[in-house]
Amino acid sequence: MKKIILTIATVLLNMALTNAQTNEKEVKFGGRIMYDIAAWGAGEFDYTGSEFRRVRFYSSGKMYGTVKYKLQLDFSGGKISFKDVWMELNKLPIQGNLRVGHFKEPLRLEALNSSKYITFMERGLPIAMSPERNTGAMYHTNFGKKLFIQSGIFRKSDDFGNDKNANNNISITSRATFLAINKGNKLLHLGVANSKRKNNNKTYSFSSRAENHLGNKLISINKEEVNYVNIFSGEVAYVNGPISLQAEALKTTINKVPDIERSFIINHEIISYYGQISYFLTGETKSYKSSLSGFGRIKPKNNYGENGWGAFELAARFSAIDMQENGSLEDVTVGLNWYLNPNTRIMFNYVKGEMANELGEITIENAVMMRVQLDF
């Protein structure tokens, strides 16, 4: 494993040293490092820990004006895994673009937003219900500067983008977003998405922490005899100068195989959602990249060390997962982000998670966390 990591790191370094931009080719190289420290527990902070949450390197580019690519590898946890490994053909009919490879399915604004730019250290609780990267093909297009459509077919894959199983677990995921306002420092983003996921292995399971990646899983569910899973989501984001609001809701329907004795289909529904608010004390505004990427880099008005202290952002969020008779989890998160410059950020989060099991018994977990983040 060490030899593999060293080899890949050497290749990526060589790519960095040979970055080039010509009339035919544009090549970029970059990466990110995120180091987390946390203390958490039920009532008191009984546990402490630290980890490199993400250590990634990537290369992306464009060739001859019609072909794009991205290669991104993650080295956190002492192992290598594929993140984005895709190729894309542009300038197809209806202003279309065809992407093939291993990448995020087009579902949910927060899930599509890069971890470099999310407001809190961890995404809200609905991430446990959201498919992220899988292997497949996606067609995406836009109609003017307001309406954006994405649709793809995917297969569940391993950490290297491979799907060698014969169970034919195929998903179709589609999303539409509308940029109702995008003028000056004001923005209103609206979106809906759907993902229908065939389950030939007849099982469905998930688990979730209380938005503390170092903490323990607090809730889980495991369903047998599942035919397919259907996810419907709605999303909204509003920016007005230094203030921003964002919310999403998901309805996950687990469709079970018809009961032989009762001869009807049994559905189980899970509702998950979050709402958040943030405010820049130093007057900056969130920047919007695109429908597929969400929000982008924050550029402080004055960088730290350059006659300034950077940018400071206060944020709060409430999120929940309701599994009906199987229990629920609710989180309250407050955060302070310090942007020293456009590429360096220090984050402070406090999370209070409240879990109710199927018997109604309550467990509360508190966590304080800090992240030091650098991307290049």
Protein language model regions, located:
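Outer-membrane beta-barrel pore domains
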Residues: 43-45, 89, 205-376
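Residue-level signature of transmembrane alpha-helix interfaces in integral membrane proteins
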Residues: 18-19, 117, 161, 257, ...
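Active-site-proximal flexible loops/turns
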Residues: 9, 108-109, 255, 356
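Intrinsically disordered, low-complexity segments enriched in glycine/proline and serine/threonine
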Residues: 5-6, 28, 251
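Bacterial Sec-dependent N-terminal signal peptides
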Residues: 1-23
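Outer membrane beta-barrel
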Residues: 22-159, 164-200, 236, 274-284, ...
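Generic structural signal for beta-strand residues in well-ordered domains
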Residues: 10-13, 50, 307, 337
